[in-house]
Amino acid sequence: MISGLVHNDDPDAVDMWMPAGSFWTQPAGEVHITATKGSNSVAYIEIEEAPYLVLPPNTAFDDGSRPINVDATNIGWTDLLGVPASAVPPRVAFLRGDPQDSQPHGMLVKRPAGYHGELQTDGACNRAVVITGQIGHPLLGGADMRKLEPGSYFSSSGNAVHRLACDGADECIIYTRTDGSIDFASAPSKN
């Protein structure tokens, strides 16, 4: 969830309004209600397989997977291992998939205010969405950093280096999804 509140559950469930930074999955074929609350509710939604069809309840099916609803206050953050001791390691929350194989996997990445560094990716399809904070990112490989607000998106394919800066007063969180590896390199803070 990027802004506002979202409820995603079966039709008989008690409302559970999840704030920005929350994460949920919804199995294909399951009857569910997705609702938002707030004047500017924005969510990033990934569809695993197209087409995504809204169908009547009598066509529901069980694909064997189960829904996951994780409120932002219950996200489990950990330091990313393998980062040089001189660097501030990113805080990550592994959300889906296995980052050790070549299948798509997603995670949240948290960087402190003042962070400057690189996000290095090598997957065939690399996506990132700003969830909170203000990220500086050069457009089309240029030198000028452009401000990306929550809801902004950047992507690449193959080997790529994304220069990032968390220049606002608050920490920055991005959601990343790739079918390759993700590495981080820090640069000295400009604050």
PLM regions with names:
Residues 1-11, 111-141:
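Glycine- and acidic-residue-biased ligand/ion/polar-headgroup-sensing regions
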Residues 5-29, 98, 139-160:
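Short acidic-glycine-tyrosine-enriched beta hairpin
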Residues 11-12, 36-37, 55-58, 120-122, ...:
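Short, solvent-exposed loop/turn and secondary-structure capping segments
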Residues 11-14, 23-25, 38-42, 51-53, ...:
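Histidine-/acidic-rich catalytic cores in large beta-rich domains
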Residues 13, 28-51, 149, 158-182:
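Ligand-binding loop in jelly-roll beta-barrel domains
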Residues 36, 100-103, 118-126, 165-168:
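Short, low-complexity cationic-aromatic patches
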Residues 53-103, 189-191:
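A short, N-terminal "cap"/entry segment at the start of jelly-roll beta-barrel domains
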Residues 104-108:
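Intrinsic, low-complexity N-terminal interaction/targeting segments
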